[in-house]
UniProtKB/Swiss-Prot annotation:
It comes from Equine herpesvirus 1 (strain Ab4p) (EHV-1). The keyword Magnesium does not apply. This is Protein UL24 homolog. The keyword Translocase does not apply. May participate in nuclear egress of viral particles. Plays a role in the dispersal of several host nucleolar proteins including NCL/nucleolin and NPM1. Since deletion of host NCL/nucleolin negatively impact on nuclear egress, UL24 supposedly acts on this process through its effect on host nucleoli. It is found in: Virion; Host cytoplasm; Host nucleus, Host nucleolus; Host Golgi apparatus. The gene is UL24. Transmembrane segments: none annotated. Induction: Expressed late in the infection cycle. One of its GO terms (cellular component) is host cell Golgi apparatus. It comes from the Viruses. Pfam families: Herpes_UL24. Keywords: Host cytoplasm, Host Golgi apparatus, Host nucleus, Late protein, Virion. Belongs to the herpesviridae UL24 family.
């Protein structure tokens, strides 16, 4: 009996991890499409529409996604930063997302889901506090928006979105994006669809061949040592009101290295 319970717990954990990874990859594709077309898809609309309208996202200077961001005591599943201008005084939005996966979606008020919700809210509160302590210097107004998302393991449908009250901090949006990307420990794998390549050899006819991405997820990348940053006074009180929506209905400069394995995340959606 105990062995069976252990196996069940392990299988549930593996299923949750697989769902997280699939959702990460879907977010990259969906957000790229929204940035390009100015329209949110069904999956992103309940997450982003109230924070950054799609048309505003389309005209943003840059949008970045980072996954499994190592903040020390906490590691938010996803952090999305949106930059609306150039310079250290540019405004921006930083959305911290915590994912909770569900095997069954008919009843969202079960005891286990309520425990997931309480744990997720606590994780988001801690993540915001830790991020505020390591903000890069800058005078730009940045909105920190924590969001808890329940996702169905089948179909990756967004079932419920719970938002903590946004907090306003001051930082450099561009450097913040790079800093967060540098702390990311996961990169979504390349699409499993076959990609066509052209092999050209001198004196021979070019031959097309296809390669498939590895099925195994990308291994964790060890983050660089956190850069020294001035401490920021905590802006997050212990009790923060939440908004729940059912998806169905003066600082010294800090140098940040741009040469890292996840540099693509900071410029993935930047205008060409």
């Amino acid at each position: 009996m105990k062995r069976r319970q252990r196996l069940t717990a392990r299988s549930r954990l593996r299923a949750g991890i697989r769902c997280h990874n699939r959702f990460y990859n879907a977010m990259v594709q969906d957000l790229a499409s929204a940035k390009r077309n100015g329209v949110y898809g069904e999956r992103l609309a309940p997450l982003f529409s109230e924070l950054v309208p799609a048309e505003t996202l389309k005209t943003a200077l840059g949008v970045s996604l980072a996954f499994e961001v190592n903040l020390g005591q906490r590691r938010p599943d996803c952090v999305c930063t949106v930059q609306f201008g150039k310079g250290s005084d540019a405004k921006g939005v930083c959305i911290l997302i915590e994912l909770k996966t569900c095997r069954f979606s008919k009843n969202m008020n079960t005891a286990s889901k309520n425990l997931q919700r309480k744990g997720g809210m606590r994780q988001l509160h801690d993540s915001c506090r830790l991020l505020a302590r390591t903000l890069p210097p800058g005078s730009g107004e940045i909105v920190l928006a924590p969001v808890l998302v329940f996702v169905a393991q089948r179909g990756m449908r967004v079932l419920r979105v719970t938002r903590l009250s946004p907090q306003v901090v001051y930082s450099n949006a561009a450097v913040l994006s790079c800093t967060i990307s540098r702390l990311a420990e996961y990169a979504p794998p390349v699409s499993a669809k076959s990609t066509r390549r052209r092999c050209v050899a001198k004196g021979t006819k070019a031959k097309a061949f296809s390669t498939k991405a590895a099925a195994e997820p990308v291994p964790s990348i060890t983050p660089a040592q956190p850069s020294a940053a001035a401490a920021v006074v905590s802006l997050f009180p212990a009790a923060v009101p939440a908004n729940t929506t059912n998806a169905a209905a003066v600082h010294q400069p800090v140098a940040v290295s741009h040469v890292n394995p996840l540099a693509w995340a900071a410029s993935l959606f930047s205008p060409k």
